[in-house]
Amino acid sequence: METKINGEELPYVVCKLNKGESVVTENGGMSWMDDGISMKTTTNGGIMKGLGRALAGESIFMNVYTAEKDDVEIAFASSFPGQILEFDLKEGETIIAQKRAFLCAEPTVDISMHFRKRIGAGFFGGEGFIMQKFQGPGRVFLELDGAIYKRELADGQKLKVDNGYVAVMTSGVDLNIETVKGCLLYTSPSPRDPKT
């Protein structure tokens, strides 16, 4: 399968398939496709896997698109402004992503829900307790809102990030939440013009 990510504000990925190659997406994920591609709806791993995906913010059912001839194209577009990132996962390699990040993948990628180890990180973090887990082998495409800044951490290195800004991480990253000491945050109605 050949792929190309196009567009800037509202990107899309075009997958060029040869006969027998497939790509998986959730219901409503496909934008357009050539003639010569068949579609099958499945739970992609059974009803329990489907329910797990539903808890992670995705659809219970997945659509599998398979090329019936060579050199056919199918496109998947982001549903909001941001970026599409491609991850080529090796056998057993795992990434964890925010809910609703999944766009499409090769059918060999295992898609499931991921519970944060520390329950406080889930309840007080902006992305919630349940995230998505993708395990290789295969390529997966994620749609993420806004601009992306990639940061690689050394062993034992800590990085403080405002809650809700963690989009994707490897399975070896330990995500926790800290409180800011000595601060009290509150809001009240305020005028639009500071002079009034």
Language-model segments: residues:
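Conserved loop->alpha-helix
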Residues: 1-22, 27-94, 156, 192
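Conserved small/polar residues in nucleotide/adenosyl-binding loops
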Residues: 186-191
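A cross-kingdom feature marking solvent-exposed beta-strand/loop segments within repeated
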Residues: 43-52, 115-120, 177-185
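Surface-exposed interaction/gating patches
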Residues: 83-175
